[in-house]
């Protein structure tokens, strides 16, 4: 009994010390993985999906964005929570549940690596064509963007990635919020829409595909939870991060990106919704349209501001996509092969593969990027409930096991994600027609 009491007293003392060590200095020092997650999210869902939802439906889909971020919060948090608590990557946790899950994740992840690298590289290059004073072919610009991103990762490693992502997110947040404030001051909450304008309704089956695409990558695909887990491990190799500070970093990144999703919705709602111009749905054409709309509504000087916002979105996403997906590919393959550890050079090989494979798609299969990206989005959305459940199952035990309100939120979120997935499958199968 005495030994048991002594152990409990020791654990209480240890926990108290951990809490006391969590200072504002340690919190800011821990920032990194959460910011990287936010940087990966804004290019995938915000600059296109959020802004288009505002342009087409005004403020109506704000509730969907809020709910998607709210109900996905636990499952992204659990990836970080498991790693901080156990010292293992989320993929190691998947392996404990069964090797089949690692295989499924690996196959989906390799496909997503190639397609997402090509897609974000193309979009980033397309944005550059709007601001460069000379005409440069998009594939050439894609080569430059992906080449620069790869060089940063190969030469600077995690430390440079960590620091660069913070600068990108600070610049992106300031400029995006400034653009919305200027648009509000010029046009008011109604934006450019006439007073008697009747918005199209998103609450019908015809709009389900758009809503599913918005939700699927809002704030990011579910595999980002595994990627974020890898970034937590990388951060702990270069800096001491406590459990409390690691969760704080995650909350800053996740809540920040959720707020930015609404800010990007406002970009579309204030200058495009209700205008006479039909909203483009293709990524590159849509960003060109958005830039032109801001220039005509606010002033020609705003063209550079919106182009800068769009470029920072996509450049930050390009870097984090190549790094994050490469890390999870290396870790997945290590676990499949049963190796104890992987060499640092393996990550360099994976990064190079992601870059070259993405460029191959751009140069030789350019027309296939759209359909392949759509398939990647659908696969990500359909697999979300499975990996969300796995993430939850890994934090039901242990020192920081999930309980109370967070457990209830995760259960409601799991039902929410599963229901939408089944609804989407039913629509695609034609059962709702």
Swiss-Prot record:
Keywords: Cell membrane, Membrane, Transmembrane, Transmembrane helix. The chain crosses the membrane at residues 28-48, 56-76, 102-122, 126-146, 164-184, 207-227, 250-270, 304-324, 345-365, 375-395, 406-426. Coiled coil: none annotated. It is a multi-pass membrane protein. The keyword Transmembrane applies. Its main location: membrane. GO terms for cellular component: plasma membrane. It is found in: Cell membrane. Signal peptide: none annotated. It comes from the Bacteria. This is Uncharacterized protein PM0681. It comes from Pasteurella multocida (strain Pm70). The lineage of its organism: Bacteria, Pseudomonadati, Pseudomonadota, Gammaproteobacteria, Pasteurellales.
């Amino acid at each position: 009994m005495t030994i048991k009491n002594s152990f409990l007293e020791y654990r209480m003392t240890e926990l108290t010390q951990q809490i006391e060590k969590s200072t504002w200095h340690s919190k800011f020092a821990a920032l990194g993985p959460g910011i990287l997650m936010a940087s990966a999210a804004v290019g995938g869902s915000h600059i296109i999906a959020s802004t288009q939802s505002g342009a087409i439906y005004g403020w109506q889909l704000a509730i969907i964005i809020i709910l998607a971020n709210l109900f996905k919060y636990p499952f992204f948090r659990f990836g970080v929570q498991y790693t901080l608590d156990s010292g293992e990557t989320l993929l190691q946790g998947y392996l404990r549940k069964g090797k089949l899950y690692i295989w499924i994740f690996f196959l989906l992840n390799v496909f997503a690596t190639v397609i997402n690298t090509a897609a974000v590289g193309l979009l980033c290059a397309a944005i550059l064509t709007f601001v460069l004073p000379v005409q440069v072919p998009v594939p050439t610009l894609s080569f430059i963007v992906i080449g620069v991103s790869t060089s940063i990762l190969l030469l600077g490693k995690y430390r440079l990635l960590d620091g660069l992502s913070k600068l990108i997110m600070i610049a992106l947040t300031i400029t995006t919020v400034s653009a919305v404030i200027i648009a509000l001051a010029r046009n008011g909450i109604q934006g450019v829409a006439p007073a008697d304008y009747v918005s199209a309704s998103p609450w019908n089956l015809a709009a389900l595909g758009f809503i599913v695409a918005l939700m699927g990558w809002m704030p990011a695909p579910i595999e980002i939870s595994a990627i974020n887990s890898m970034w937590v491990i990388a951060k702990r190799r270069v800096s001491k991060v406590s459990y409390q500070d690691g969760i704080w970093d995650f909350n800053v990144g996740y809540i920040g990106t959720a707020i930015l999703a609404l800010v990007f919705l406002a970009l579309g709602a204030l200058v495009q919704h209700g205008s006479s111009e039909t909203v483009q749905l293709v990524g590159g054409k849509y960003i060109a349209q958005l830039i032109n709309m801001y220039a005509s509504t606010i002033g020609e000087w705003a063209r550079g501001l919106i182009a800068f916002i769009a470029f920072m979105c996509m450049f930050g996403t390009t870097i984090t996509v190549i790094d994050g997906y490469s890390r999870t590919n290396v870790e997945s393959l290590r676990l499949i092969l049963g190796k104890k550890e992987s060499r640092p050079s393996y990550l360099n090989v994976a990064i190079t593969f992601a870059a070259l494979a993405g460029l191959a798609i751009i140069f030789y299969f350019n027309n296939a990027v759209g359909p392949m990206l759509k398939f990647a989005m659908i696969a990500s959305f359909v697999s979300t409930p499975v990996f969300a459940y796995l993430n939850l199952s890994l934090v039901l035990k242990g020192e920081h096991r999930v309980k109370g309100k967070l457990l209830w939120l995760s259960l409601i979120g799991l039902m929410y994600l599963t229901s939408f997935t089944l609804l989407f499958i039913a629509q695609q199968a034609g059962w709702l027609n």
